[in-house]
Amino acid sequence: FRRARDGGLLDKANVAMLSPYTAINRDELMRVFYLSRRRHHQFGASDVAFYDLAERMACNINENEFSKLYPRDATEKGFINTFNHITAQALMTTLFSEELADFIADVHERLRPELITGKFSKEQIDDLDEGPLDNYVDMINNEWGQELGKKLKLKYGIEPGTKWTPELLANYLNDIQKYYQQSLKMEFIPFRQEDYLIIRFSEKLNIVMGDLPKFVKKAEAQL
């Protein structure tokens, strides 16, 4: 995919033959790429991405709950990873489709062929951070994210041309936090539309879901 993005016509044709879905949905996949990466040279020094939302959600856990956490839960491989998978998959499903979100999830997890063959080494099985258990948990979280994304898309009537206001984004993310609250039996500090992260990500959503090629061309011309 990276070779196709940065390479020539032959690289792009090769991806089209190997993965027609990628070629057909190239535009939407590119928009997801921008939402999932911090692009400071295009969106400014304070650019934010999916991961920043997950990180903030982990910070939103009520401080009284932290004493109950296992040390690993407070790490990047703990709740942040869980929130990142579910929240990103929910947003991708809401913005685009469950099919696209599922495709991206499968491509990400299939970096390990052992997940399909089931032939794991003992070292892989014992590796809780990067082994099969981690991947399978991610896959389950991806599915829950997609279900949340479908429900929230209907609740807020979100369409491709929907303008993402800070209020809409805060409400959307608070609904996801309510799901975490019910599932994990933990209290969360709600997002506010005045939060800087909410303002920045809602702005980015509107750019990415709008005339993205025009924005990118203009941003790169100013470098």
Predicted regions and their residues:
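Intrinsically disordered, low-complexity, mixed-charge
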Residues: 1-103, 111-223
